[in-house]
């Protein structure tokens, strides 16, 4: 089990845009991400996510498994077009590698596993920028 207090004290706090197709799943997952110390903006559906990208910039965009397959395919392009440096994590991989997705996870991974993936991704990025 992930210790949220340790995660909250990490050296980075990300500004995350998290989109799902299901509001209940979105609420429970977003709560866990906030407890890990990140600032989370939540949206339900593709149009709301597109609108959020027009009004603000984010460090990371999470595309949840309850978004449609079509949305999970097209939204990474839209994210990178709006903000090239924003990282994209798709929480339900459909197989092949998407050129605009920075990290993809398999279906059914726990939120703790997703948080570990985010921490690992950011630690790698920190190492690269420090060189």
Model-flagged regions — what are they?
Residues 54-56, 79-85, 95:
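Conserved phosphotransfer cores of two-component systems
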Residues 22-41:
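Two-component/phosphorelay signaling modules centered on CheY-like receiver
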Residues 69, 74, 89-116:
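Alpha4 helix (beta4-alpha4-beta5 surface) of REC/receiver domains from two-component response regulators
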Residues 42-60:
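Acidic, metal-coordinating helix/loop segments flanking the phosphotransfer/catalytic sites
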Residues 23, 44-48, 109:
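Acidic phosphotransfer microenvironment of two-component signaling modules
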Residues 1-21, 32, 109-131:
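Non-catalytic signal-transmission and effector/linker regions of two-component phosphorelay proteins
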Residues 61-83:
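Conserved phosphotransfer microenvironments
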Residues 17, 41-42, 87-92:
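Short, hydrophobic beta-strand segments that form beta-sheet elements in well-ordered domains
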């Amino acid at each position: 089990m992930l210790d949220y207090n340790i995660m909250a004290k990490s050296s980075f706090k990300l500004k995350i845009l998290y989109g799902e197709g299901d509001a209940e799943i979105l609420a429970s997952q977003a709560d866990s991400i906030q407890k890990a110390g990140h600032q989370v903006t939540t949206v339900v559906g593709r149009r709301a996510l597109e609108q959020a990208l027009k009004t603000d910039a984010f460090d990371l965009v999470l595309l949840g498994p309850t978004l449609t397959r079509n949305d999970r395919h097209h939204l990474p392009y839209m994210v990178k077009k709006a903000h090239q440096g924003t990282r994209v994590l798709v929480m339900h991989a459909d197989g092949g590698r998407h050129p605009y997705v920075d990290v993809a996870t398999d279906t059914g991974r726990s939120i703790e596993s997703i948080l570990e993936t985010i921490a690992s991704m950011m630690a790698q990025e920190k190492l690269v920028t420090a060189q």
